[in-house]
């Protein structure tokens, strides 16, 4: 991705830049997918752009999900920001909007959507039934951290001179 970014400043380096972005995108780099999709859209390669945004969304890029939501809303061809030559599809708009909200709410946790194809596959695939949940969230919620025993808390607190109930220092030091 970094090399592709550097090549964006080199005259006539566009083809190699897109190839670098595509390679990074296929390895799961969300910003590379977004940039690949954006450059493909400018070149009129709408199918490649659509696939790039899908990759970026799967990798956790919320803005790509938002772009797909807007693109499936059927903007006119003169709308250069969101036009991808797609037919209006209200259900896809809603699903991508839900994905955008999910990724935005969990961005600080590094959320991804590995089950994206089972939620909203690219056309011409028919939309499957969806229960409104995300695999990443289900896995995260099921992996509850182990609560340390009171004995361990006492031991560690004593080693550091902390109150085991509050985590604050036992003695206040004067400056």
Predicted regions: what is each one?
Residues 50-62, 69-106:
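TPR/TPR-like (Sel1-like) alpha-helical repeat modules
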Residues 86, 91-141:
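Extracytoplasmic and endomembrane cell-envelope/extracellular-matrix remodeling and assembly machinery
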Residues 5, 21-22, 38, 54:
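Amphipathic alpha-helical repeat scaffolds
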Residues 1, 7-10, 26-33, 40, ...:
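Short helix-capping/linker turns of helical repeat alpha-solenoids
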Residues 67-73, 117-121:
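Acidic helix/loop microenvironments that form the catalytic cleft of cell-wall polysaccharide enzymes
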Residues 10-20, 43-52, 88-92:
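Structural signature of tandem alpha-helical TPR/SEL1-like repeats
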Residues 121-175:
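Long C-terminal extensions of eukaryotic subunits of large macromolecular complexes
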């Amino acid at each position: 991705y970094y090399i592709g970014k550097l090549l964006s400043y080199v005259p006539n380096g566009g083809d190699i830049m897109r190839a670098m972005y595509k390679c990074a995108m296929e390895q799961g780099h969300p910003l590379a997918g977004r940039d690949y999709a954006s450059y493909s859209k400018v070149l009129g390669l709408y199918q490649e752009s659509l696939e790039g945004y899908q990759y970026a969304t799967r990798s956790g890029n919320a803005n790509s999900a938002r772009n797909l939501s807007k693109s499936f809303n059927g903007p006119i061809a003169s709308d250069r920001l969101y036009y991808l030559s797609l037919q209006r599809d209200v259900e896809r708009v809603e699903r991508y909007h839900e994905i955008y909200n999910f990724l935005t709410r969990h961005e600080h946790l590094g959320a991804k959507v590995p089950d994206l194809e089972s939620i909203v596959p690219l056309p011409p695939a028919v939309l499957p039934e969806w229960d409104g949940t995300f695999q990443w969230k289900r896995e995260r919620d099921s992996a509850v951290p182990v609560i340390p025993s009171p004995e361990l808390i006492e031991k560690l607190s004593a080693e550091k001179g902390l109150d085991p109930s509050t985590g604050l220092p036992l003695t206040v030091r004067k400056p």
